[in-house]
């Protein structure tokens, strides 16, 4: 046994991989958070991008990633993550994951997205959670209210007002797409701990880059129609049958094209009637649509863009370290330049596995010790989250401009909500206002082109 206690906040793919990797080396590990089924990883349909098919290569996958990220990716990070794809694949397979096929998705040069019946997360997460339990990972169910930090030193995490002390804490809570009115992800993913750390002096990175999935379906709740459906040949059309975009363009391009058609008052539909084996290839999507009274073999599927993934988050280095010793962030909660201005489809789960493996190595190498024995507790009420969601959707959405962003910032001041949620929203609005160009998922109608002077990452840092 290694004399070190590690707390991982969040039990999605990144958190589970980190926990398994650490406990296998004799570290005392606890995962604190809701059930793993309540994570965006569990909802992931399409799969995981691995450059392992014939004709593909790490270099080609790197180039696809940087092209999608509109050239502000950290190239060292991109190479680091994708060069570890074989290790990531081997980790999953050795722990019982069996992929059933591979698909082509938008922005990819090859069909490198490895999937399990197009409901990948639903299969991978239970397998890894079972392994984690068998290995002795301690699962603590609950809602972590804040990270315990005193004078810049880590003490642990607060759960129901009680400080749980750890030598190292890994934030693996996911992103903040739940701060938007329409999202197909977990509504509870509102970026609370991202804002918490910002208020405690930890920089945030690239917060203006929010990816909107082009093909959300709003029924009894909001669902995603996986990108792989378009990869299999489905077409995007208006109500009168007009095709208006290359369906396999990157998500930012497709989402914006759909949104602009909707602004013209036109409905947009996915025509999947030409996919003969739809039910077998996409069983989850098929079952959802049938319950909503839509037969994808006969009917057009109404779609709309929805907030899906946040490229920004807690600023970390290539080893997933924050500026506070012993505090790390991985997966969607973290941002180190892997995705740039726009995430390439199915790169997120690859990042989850690689960041989980990498942060475990970092912790084992550094062997951090708890820096403080107590910390102030400030959590109160979340407050009016829905008003923030409306502001984000209306003022920091798919199409932005100066006047709308300024109006959003002004409205935000009057919202009575947790300051940590407000600072997440403020970071998005502020960095979107400062970035006077359009790049990737960030589109300014008043600055509709990329500009060389903005070919760099963005940082949001409060002086505390």
UniProtKB/Swiss-Prot annotation:
Cited Pfam families: FAD_binding_2, Succ_DH_flav_C
Protein name: L-aspartate oxidase
Record has Cytoplasm as a keyword: yes
Molecular-function GO terms, alphabetical: L-aspartate oxidase activity; nucleotide binding
Disulfide-bond pairs as recorded: none
Protein's gene: nadB
Pathway the protein takes part in: Cofactor biosynthesis; NAD(+) biosynthesis; iminoaspartate from L-aspartate (oxidase route): step 1/1
Origin superkingdom: Archaea
Cofactor: FAD
Chain sites annotated for binding FAD: 11-14, 40-47, 332, 348-349
Keywords noted in UniProt: Cytoplasm, FAD, Flavoprotein, Nucleotide-binding, Oxidoreductase, Pyridine nucleotide biosynthesis
GO BP: NAD biosynthetic process
Family the UniProt entry places it in: Belongs to the FAD-dependent oxidoreductase 2 family. NadB subfamily.
Entries under NCBIfam families matching the protein: nadB (TIGR00551), PRK08401.1 (NF006254)
Cofactor info, note text: Binds 1 FAD per subunit.
Catalyses which reaction(s): L-aspartate + O2 = iminosuccinate + H2O2
Subcellular localization: Cytoplasm
Known function: Catalyzes the oxidation of L-aspartate to iminoaspartate, the first step in the de novo biosynthesis of NAD(+).
Provenance organism: Pyrococcus abyssi (strain GE5 / Orsay)
EC number(s) recorded for this UniProt protein: 1.4.3.16
């Amino acid at each position: 046994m290694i004399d070190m206690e590690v707390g991982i906040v969040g039990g999605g793919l990144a958190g589970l991989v980190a926990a398994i990797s650490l406990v296998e080396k004799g570290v005392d590990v606890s995962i604190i958070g809701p059930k793993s089924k309540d994570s965006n990883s569990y909802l992931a349909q399409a799969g995981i991008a691995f450059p392992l098919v014939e004709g593909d290569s790490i270099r080609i996958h790197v180039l696809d990633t940087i092209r999608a990220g509109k050239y502000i990716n950290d190239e060292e990070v991109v190479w680091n993550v994708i060069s570890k794809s074989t290790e990531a694949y081997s980790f999953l397979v050795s722990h019982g994951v069996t992929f059933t096929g591979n698909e082509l998705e938008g922005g990819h040069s090859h069909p490198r997205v490895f999937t399990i019946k197009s409901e990948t997360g639903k299969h991978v997460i239970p397998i890894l959670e079972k392994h984690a339990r068998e290995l002795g990972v301690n699962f603590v169910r609950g809602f972590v209210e804040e990270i315990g930090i005193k004078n810049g030193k880590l003490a642990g995490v607060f759960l129901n007002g009680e400080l749980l002390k750890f030598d190292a804490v890994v934030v693996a809570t996911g992103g903040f797409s739940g701060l938007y009115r329409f999202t197909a992800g977990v509504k509870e993913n509102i970026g609370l701990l991202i804002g918490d750390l910002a208020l405690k002096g930890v920089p945030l990175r690239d917060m203006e880059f929010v990816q909107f999935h082009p093909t959300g379906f709003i029924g009894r709740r909001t669902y995603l129609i996986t990108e792989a459906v378009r990869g299999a040949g489905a077409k995007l059309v208006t109500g009168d049958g007009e095709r208006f975009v290359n369906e396999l363009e990157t998500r930012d391009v497709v989402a914006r094209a759909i949104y602009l058609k909707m602004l013209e008052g036109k409905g947009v539909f996915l025509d999947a009637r030409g996919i003969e084996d739809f039910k077998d290839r996409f069983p989850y999507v098929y079952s959802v649509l049938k319950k909503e009274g839509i037969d994808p073999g006969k009917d057009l599927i109404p779609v709309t863009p929805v907030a899906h993934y946040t490229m920004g988050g807690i600023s970390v280095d290539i080893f997933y370290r924050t500026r506070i010793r012993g505090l790390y962030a991985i997966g969607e909660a973290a941002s180190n330049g892997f995705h740039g201005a726009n995430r390439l489809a199915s790169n997120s789960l690859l990042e989850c596995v690689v960041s989980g493996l990498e942060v475990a190595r970092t912790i084992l190498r550094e062997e951090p010790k708890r820096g403080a024995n107590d910390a102030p507790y400030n959590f109160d009420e979340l407050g009016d989250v829905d008003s923030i969601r409306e502001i984000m959707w209306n003022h920091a959405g798919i199409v932005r401009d100066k006047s709308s962003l300024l109006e959003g910032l002004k409205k935000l001041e009057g919202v009575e909500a947790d300051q940590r949620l407000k600072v997440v929203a403020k970071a998005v609005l502020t960095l979107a206002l400062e970035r006077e160009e359009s790049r990737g998922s960030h589109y300014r109608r008043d600055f509709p082109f990329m500009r060389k002077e903005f070919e760099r990452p963005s940082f949001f840092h409060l002086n505390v």
